Every structure is written in structure tokens, then in C-alpha cells.
Amino acid sequence: MVQVVLGEDEGIESALRRFKRQVSKAGILADVKRRRHFETPLEKKKRKRIATRRKRRFR
């Protein structure tokens, strides 16, 4: 879970920016988008296979 503690002299805008950055680093939005619709086992395998190819290419 992502938490942002507001500093004493910190504005809401900067805290919101930090929160958005932490959420994107944690991959929460990508996970929510992926789980929005049911994914069949075949689609899961295909997604994982593509991710593996991407990882190999950038190594």
C-alpha cells in the first residue's frame, strides 16, 4: 500500500506528485487496468510470453 505523509511545510500539490510517482512505481494502475476484464489462461500465457521477449531484448 502506498502512503504519503504530509510534511510540516509541504503543500498538497507536492504531496500529490509524490503519491502519483509512488503509485506508478508500484505498478498499481497497470495492475488495475489488467484486472478490469477477465483474462483467459491463453491470454495470460500470451502476455507472459511477450513480457519474456521484452526482457530478453533489453538485457
Swiss-Prot record:
GO BP annotations, alphabetical order: translation
Spans traversing the lipid bilayer: none
GO cellular component: ribonucleoprotein complex; ribosome
The keyword Membrane belongs to this UniProt entry's keyword annotation: no
An MF annotation (GO) of this entry: structural constituent of ribosome
UniProt cross-references to InterPro entries, sorted A to Z: Ribosomal_bS21, Ribosomal_bS21_CS, Ribosomal_bS21_sf
HAMAP family: Ribosomal_bS21 (MF_00358)
Family designation: Belongs to the bacterial ribosomal protein bS21 family.
Protein name: Small ribosomal subunit protein bS21
Source organism (scientific name): Acaryochloris marina (strain MBIC 11017)
